[in-house]
A protein has these predicted regions:
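Divalent metal-dependent catalytic cores for phosphoryl transfer on phosphate-bearing substrates
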Residues: 1-77
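Charged phosphate-binding loop/patch that engages nucleotide di/tri-phosphates or the phosphate backbone
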Residues: 82-107
Length: 107
């Protein structure tokens, strides 16, 4: 979880990146959050479905990612939270908020 905020910090302070949309996409690409920009959603989804991912259901996520950004976010955050619950891991508060937000979105 910490590599996102650390990468954003380093990009800003070492590389001079000042675009908040880019920095936020870096910060939240593993947790998600309420109010994500289009770029943040794309990076979040891309990280989850990148080619080296081999988990059950990744092909379905890849398919929906080519069809509908909102549905892809819903599916990805659901999969992420379900995985954490199933493996009895702590869930970052922003991820819970993001999940709850997408429960209210129309499918």
């Amino acid at each position: 979880i910490m590599h996102g905020p650390i990468a954003a910090y380093r990009a800003m302070h070492e590389l001079g990146v000042q675009d908040e949309d880019i920095l936020n996409a870096m910060r939240y690409h593993t947790t998600g959050r309420v109010g994500m920009s289009r770029l943040e959603k794309i990076i979040y989804i891309a990280d989850m479905i990148e080619p080296s991912r081999k988990f059950d259901g990744v092909e379905a996520l890849r398919k929906v990612a080519t069809e509908d950004l909102t549905k892809a976010m819903q599916a990805c955050i659901y999969h992420s939270v379900k995985f954490l619950v199933d493996t009895k891991q702590a869930i970052y508060p922003l991820s819970i908020e993001c999940y709850n937000h997408y429960l209210g979105e129309e499918y």
